[in-house]
Amino acid sequence: MTKPQNNSTDPREYFTDERCHILELHNTADDPGVSLARARVEPGVTTAWHTVEATIERYIIVSGTGIAEVGDAPALSLIAGDHLLIPAGKKQRIHNPGSVDLIFHCICTPRFERRNYRSLED
């Protein structure tokens, strides 16, 4: 049995090449099974097409509105309280059509690792 751990994360939000802001809430090698981040997409912005290999993502919309495109499925409109499952390796992006920031939590299993991220844009 493992001991309970208290891990601290960097409290600073950062801007990504994907065109969204990320605040890592939990992502450590000590807990490889899961990571949690808060994502923020500014009004009018569409994130870059990308995949995350070997990682399942779940978005939980906190506030704002979004239009998600995953794989070849029709676009999905999202509002606060909605959940979105993104299978590992599926191309994806999200658009904020609203006038306020789109904020969502992103739960990754196993944890997000930069080496698994693939941009599909130039």
In which residue ranges do the predicted regions lie?
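A short, N-terminal "cap"/entry segment at the start of jelly-roll beta-barrel domains
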Residues: 1-34, 116-122
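Conserved hydrophobic/aromatic beta-strand scaffold that supports enzyme active sites
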Residues: 22-24, 36-40, 58, 75, ...
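Non-catalytic surface loops within mature trypsin-like serine protease
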Residues: 29, 43, 72, 109-111
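Short strand-connecting beta-turns/loops that link adjacent beta-strands
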Residues: 30-31, 54, 73, 99-100
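Conserved short histidine dyad/triad with adjacent acidic residue
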Residues: 37-53
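Short intrinsically disordered coil segments
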Residues: 40, 56, 119-122
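A short beta-strand-loop-beta hairpin characteristic of the jelly-roll/cupin
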Residues: 46, 53-80, 90
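Ligand-binding loop in jelly-roll beta-barrel domains
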Residues: 67, 75, 80, 88-114
